[in-house]
Amino acid sequence: MRILHFYRTAFPDTMGGIEQVIHQLALGASQSGIEVDVLSLSSDKQIKSIEFNGYWTHRAHLDFQLASTGFSLSVIRQFSRLAKKADVIHYHFPWPFMDVVHFVTGVKKPTIVTYHSDIIRQKELLFIYRPLMNRFLGSVDRIVATSPNYRATSQVMVRYSDKTSVIPIGLDKATYPKPSQDRMKYWSERLGGKFFLFIGVIRY
């Protein structure tokens, strides 16, 4: 089996939450004997496909970015080529240009969308994008919500509840960076023996 993940950014170019999810899925699948390709955009001038921790990452040149949406003409051809070899295509939402690529290339493979987030900041542009978004989400085979609460409260996902499944994001603890004992002692003395630290990409 061969899986193609498609999103606007990915390791090793950028380090964020969705990138980490894609990496963990690709890593886990490759360790189970599944061939995995990850396709994303990059502003790097030296673009080439590289093997990364057991799976292949492919990058197309980022032509320009508008309202957090990356655009690339060359990615259309790359996606078409990789999609022909794939058994399953795994999209990561939201990325409006991804929807365009999906329809332009005429994908005929089983398709999954992991729905990571509603569109929050670009609500004015959502009015323009909504018809394409609904057509895209309506065309894929399955949608994955990352929590039961998200599936129940997202106005977009409620519309597609009949083909939405909940699969919580799982992370391999073995890949966590190990904190130094000095730093752990420092924070334990200030916060107590047990505490949570949440870190993510600061986008808004």
List each model region and its residues.
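Carbohydrate-associated surface elements
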Residues: 42, 149, 170
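Acidic anion/phosphate-binding donor-loop and adjacent secondary structure
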Residues: 155, 170-187
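A short, histidine- and acid-enriched strand-loop-helix "catalytic/donor-clamping" loop
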Residues: 67, 96-97, 111-126, 139-142
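N-terminal strand-loop element at the rim of the active site
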Residues: 6-15, 21-70
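An aromatic- and histidine-rich active-site surface loop
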Residues: 74-76, 88-108, 120
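Conserved donor-binding/catalytic core segment of Leloir-type glycosyltransferases
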Residues: 4, 184-204
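Short hydrophobic "strand-cap" motifs at the C-terminus of beta-strands
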Residues: 6, 146, 167, 198-200
